[in-house]
Each structure stands twice: as structure tokens, then as C-alpha cells.
Amino acid sequence: SYSAWLSTTSFTGGCNASMSNNGGSAPPACGGSKTVTWTVTSTCEPNVTCSAVFTVTAAPAVVLTCPANQTEAACQTQTAINNAFNTWLTNVSFSGGCNAAISNNNTGAPPACGGATTVTWTVTSSCEPNKTCQAVFTVTNAPTVVLTCASNNTQAACQTQSAIDAAYSAWLNSATFTGGCNAAISNTGG
């Protein structure tokens, strides 16, 4: 474009006239301007000059917007966490730059039982330093299992077997727990 623009200047008249300019190289592709002076020399009169400016507009600044940090509850399936994580990754956006491209250092979703993954997104552009932003995807830790065992139990002798069986069953069922993900209680009592 610059070369073609330089060649648009013309002149007429003069004796043995010739035209030159101080155009040199074009301004930077990422933005800038250059004032060029053309000079016509002729053997019959003083030099005649004119000037014009060639401008390349500045590249639009890169604007990078990361997704907000996101927290997911524990005890979901790993597939559900992976799906939520992958959707979250797509919530990044950017604009501006020249020949801009975006990448990230994603290493995968955190475990469904709890953890966090920090992702850094980077936009590279021909006309400015890399722009980066970070966000964190967290899965809350699964609640700790708290097991309360049955208390020792002593039964009097000479009861019927069905009474002992009923007391034993009730005693086995007196063990309780809280927490965990999809937790279940079992015992070796038979």
C-alpha cells in the first residue's frame, strides 16, 4: 500500500525535471505515520516540493475477559464435573489485537471428590505483548465421614432366641455416620 501511495504523486513541466522523495520504508504495520516530501528539481527554476502523510491506524488493544471463578459441590459424578469444567472453559472472551489467538494451560478438571484447577489464558497478538488472565475452578471437598459405632451391649441370659436376635439387630443398626459422597454403611455382624 505504501509503495503504491508513493507512486501516486506526479508532476508536469520543468526542464530536464526529475522527482524524488524521502519516503524510505513504510510506517510500522501496527500503527504509525510518516510524512513524505517529494521534490522536483528542474534546471530552469528552484526546486518545487510537496508533502503528504501516510498513516497506519493503531491496532486495537487486546481486551481479555476470563470466566469468573466457579465452585461446584462435591459428590457429583466425575462426568458431571468434567462437563461443568469444559463449559466454564468456553466462557473466556477477547477482542482486539492483530492476528490475535487465544490459548490456555488447561490440565483437566479437578477430582469430583474435591480440588481446584487454575487456568491461565493467553492472547498473543502481532502488535502488543501477550495478555493473560487466570481463573479457578473448584470442587468443594467431600464432607469427612464421621462414624459413630454402636455402644457395647450386654444382654441378660435366658431370653428367647428371637428376643436376642431382635436386640442384636437393633444394636447393629444403632451405628450411624455422616458425611462422605454416596456413602453406605456395612458391618461384619452377619
What annotation goes with each model-predicted range?
Residues 1-190:
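Proline-threonine-serine-rich low-complexity tracts
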